[in-house]
Amino acid sequence: MAKIGSEGVKLLMADSTNSLSEGFSKSESVVDEQITDIIRAHNGRVIIATFASNIFRLKHIIESCQENNRKIITFGRSMENAIEIALNNGLIEDKTIFIDANQAKDMKHKEVCILCTGTQGEPLAALSRIANGTHKQISLLPDDLVVFSSSAIPGNASSINNVINKLY
């Protein structure tokens, strides 16, 4: 570490989540393909919960929605903040892909993707409120498809399962 620091590196960022799990995780390109397939194939709204901090994943979801003529509604403060930061820094270029919940009311369900927080079952996150029926702007529809685009952080399985059970 001292050698790297002496070479001018000022910050090392690392993620050790699931580092004790054996084997390999899927490549991000495999995940990207699966997300694109879902967005393309589903005839209803697609609700994707993912980590707001994963800008690369957000960017791919946005590109898949553009390719498949879907507009995006974002829910969750951290998601909205991450999108705004990415737009302001040129990481995401097309602001017109984003709409609000009122604009979506007049659209075909196949033309809408909802990007939200709540992959870990956090009780106040957007997905939990959607699942509980307490979200002020959106309710689940029979043809909605909910995608958890994340892995469970150890210790969160029970909270995640509670949200999944409420989605049924």
Label each residue range with its predicted role:
Residues 1-107, 122-139, 155-162:
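His/Asp/Glu-rich metal-coordinating catalytic cores
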Residues 165-168:
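Short helix-loop-beta junction
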Residues 146-148:
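Extracellular/luminal Protease-associated
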Residues 111-120:
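Conserved two-lobed SF2 helicase motor
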Residues 10, 112, 144:
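Conserved acidic residues
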Residues 118-119, 150-154:
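Aromatic- and Gly/Pro-rich donor/ligand-binding loops
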